[in-house]
Amino acid sequence: MRDWRLSRAPGPGEGYLELEWRPGTCQVDYGNFRATVAGEPLDLKLLVATLPHPDDRQCVATRSQRSECMCAGLAEIFGRWGRAPRLVVLDNATEAGRMVRGEVTESALFSQFKGHYRFESRYCNPYSGNEKGSVENAVGFLRRNLLVPVPSFGSMAELNRSLAEGCARLNASARCRDGRPSGEALREDLSEMRALPGVAFDAVRWVPVRADKRGYVEVDGREYVAGPAWHDRRLLAGVRAGTVEILADRGRRVAVLPRAFGEGPAVRNPLSLVPALVARPRAFGESTIRRDMPAGLVEGIDRMDAAGRRRALRSISRASEASGFEAACRAALRVVEGGRVPDDATVDLLARRIAAGGGDAPGGPDLGVYDGFLKGAVSGGR
């Protein structure tokens, strides 16, 4: 047995070499974890970046490993350090790029990100985690210390704030390999790193799309509603970590919608339906926008003629630009309850006050005088 084991022992070229990392070098890798966000259980990605010299560990939660999510996450981590590394060592399996037979092909967005922060990149050999052992260990360490048991948060922003605080707490008690406090060695890294650019990097991936006859476009396998007014048109989708922006020719903004991942219904903004309804107000009776409005407002618009519907919908659309769709609908509902057809000036004024904390908000201004005016009860306002 001894002879058999010796005959199969690793040769001198098969062992692991101990690597020494210069200050200003960063390692990046991904891990997986589960969390409940806004009441929904999600499978998320943990983007981890380390500075091996001081053993400083940072992480960000993302919904995907796509290049726009990765660049946005790294930008957040660089912001925590207040500096950008000179060299980033990545896994060959990330969305940043691929190394095949020694030749690296990077994504266009990551190449732009590199140029913005002025760092160099290096890719590990396949199945060679020891080449970036610092971040490999950090993925498991941070997951065990910050994400067990399964955490629950109200939003992704709240989750990432918690991760940032947890990383700061763990780094405060960490020590680097020579026994010094991590914070002491971190100062050496920061002195070797580059200053952050004065302008933030917009991590956006632009994708040409074509709207179908309903005004729907498809991005990464998920449908987004540009609106019926844009049916059968060629459009441009700007895909960011949290949003999808749809542009028409000459950069005209069509819609900005929340980013969705995986399978599910089409993502829509009720306002994208309004232009088509203004042109064809009778279609309001069967429009999906009804589910986004208060029941009283829907009933009021149903009782209006075509001209009244057009006027009401246009006023909601215009007020939404400054105050948001929900505030505009609440304002229009007040006008309808007063027995009048919503108009631009009245809905805009009420919506602005509601959005600023008035209306039904506790401690907000009393809008009863507006209700009285709309019902004809305030004689001085006639």
Language model features with spans:
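Active-site beta-loop-alpha junctions of metal-dependent nucleic acid enzymes
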Residues: 60-87, 260-266
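Mobile-element integrase/transposase regions
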Residues: 3-57, 65-69, 203-219
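Acidic/histidine-rich, metal-coordinating catalytic segments
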Residues: 83-102
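RNase H-like two-metal-ion nuclease catalytic core shared by retroviral integrases
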Residues: 90, 101, 121-143, 159
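Active-site-proximal acidic segments at structured loop/helix or strand boundaries
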Residues: 139-241
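Two-metal-ion acidic nuclease core segments, chiefly of the RNase H-like superfamily
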Residues: 103-121
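Protein C-terminal end segments and domain termini
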Residues: 248-382
